[in-house]
């Protein structure tokens, strides 16, 4: 599942999401 929770996602988690 692809989720875009920018309000709850941290910068590190966002970077990990981009890698995955």
Curated annotation (Swiss-Prot):
UniProt KW Hydrolase keyword: yes
Name the UniProt record assigns to this protein: Ribosome-inactivating protein
Region (Disordered): 1-20
Enzyme class: hydrolase
Entry's EC annotation: 3.2.2.22
Catalytic activity: Endohydrolysis of the N-glycosidic bond at one specific adenosine on the 28S rRNA
Record key words, sorted: Hydrolase, Plant defense, Protein synthesis inhibitor, Toxin
Gene Ontology biological process terms, A to Z: defense response; negative regulation of translation
């Amino acid at each position: 599942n692809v989720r875009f929770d920018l309000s709850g996602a941290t910068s590190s988690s966002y970077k990990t999401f981009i890698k995955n």
